[in-house]
Regions:
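Acidic, surface-exposed loops and disordered segments
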Residues: 1-177
Length: 177
């Protein structure tokens, strides 16, 4: 967490924003996300993997055939710039971040990190804490090399000996239901 360290929190937010922007404005990476995007409750229930998107406007655009998963929006389109702006507002209100760093990066380590994150997510939820993974800056494509290096430096993880396996923004939300 970093709510009591405003300068560190600002760095986390800036790296997350840059990773988000790069992924959205790089057509091939945006298309990767579209391929695993689950739009609406029905798709989420049918496919328990991938990215869940429940925004009513997007659900209706998809139902009407006006939301393409085969073509990325132009980087300067409202679909992209609007998401970047909206997410910037969310990041600005983020009170903290959580991260998991491992020694090494073999498949067993990756799976164990995922299992540990799932346990943390469940415990956090039980206490009213919400988490959103910020994996954009942890990916390994050329365009995101700078945010990747920045987040590893910020978290004092030295690749390849150490890997940031999970990085999430955390905060509080009203109970659902």
């Amino acid at each position: 967490m970093c709510a009591d360290q405003p300068a560190v929190l600002t760095q986390h937010r800036a790296i997350a924003a840059e990773g988000w922007r790069i992924e959205l404005q790089t057509p091939r990476t945006f298309l990767e996300s579209l391929k695993v995007m689950r739009i609406g409750a029905k798709e989420v229930a049918e496919h328990r993997d991938g990215l869940s998107l429940l925004d009513p406007m997007v659900v209706w655009l998809s139902r009407l055939g006006l939301f393409s998963r085969s073509e990325a929006p132009k980087p300067d389109s409202y679909a992209i710039t609007g998401q970047i702006k909206d997410f910037g507002v969310k990041l600005d209100s983020t009170p903290g971040f959580l991260w998991m760093v491992s020694d090494g990066n073999d498949r067993i380590t990756q799976v164990n990190a995922g299992r540990a994150y799932a346990r943390v997510q469940l415990a956090a939820t039980a206490h009213g804490v919400v988490m959103q993974p910020m994996q954009q800056a942890l990916q390994e494509f050329a365009e995101v090399a700078r945010p990747y290096a920045d987040v590893h430096r910020l978290l004092q993880a030295s690749p390849p000996a150490q890997t940031v396996q999970m990085w999430a923004r955390v905060g509080f939300a009203a109970p659902v239901g």
